Regions:
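Electrostatic, structured charged patches in enzyme active sites and in nucleic-acid/phosphate-binding
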Residues: 1-135
């Protein structure tokens, strides 16, 4: 059972599993699946989307995005974000993230919105792994 801590304005319930704090039940669900399947991943990865710059006399801060998971799998980097509700800010950052990695075919960017999508995606990865073993 996942203990709840506090609900935020989007209805997410923050949870703690194994001493790790998650912003939502969906994020915690994916963490548990990745860990149970022994997958190599990093959690809460910060990515610079737009570097800091100077405009006239003003210093403009860098624009960053925190992606929930960076999964290293079959020679690829898979950035996974769990978000049940898409805000206008998250949509823009998602597009900037895709733009940042557009020339890197070994990079995948995935946005999972439900536990059903999480199960389906991890299932596809496991099937792909089995196919590679047969080759």
């Amino acid at each position: 059972m996942i203990p709840s801590i506090k609900r935020n304005k989007y209805g997410n319930t923050k949870v703690i599993i194994e001493g790790v704090k998650f912003d939502s039940k969906l994020e915690a669900f994916l963490y548990k699946i990745l860990k149970d399947n022994g997958m190599d991943f990093d959690f809460q990865v910060n990515i610079e989307l737009v570097p800091k710059f100077r405009f006239q006399y003003e210093n403009i801060r860098a624009l960053n995005m925190r992606v929930d998971f960076l999964l290293r799998y079959n020679g690829r980097e898979i950035y996974i974000d769990t978000k049940g509700f898409a805000t206008s800010e998250s949509k823009i950052k998602y597009k900037l993230l895709k733009n940042k990695f557009k020339a890197e075919p070994q990079v995948n960017i995935i946005w999972l919105k439900t536990q059903k999508e999480v199960n389906a995606y991890i299932g596809r990865l496991k099937e792909e792994k089995e196919e590679w073993k047969l080759l």
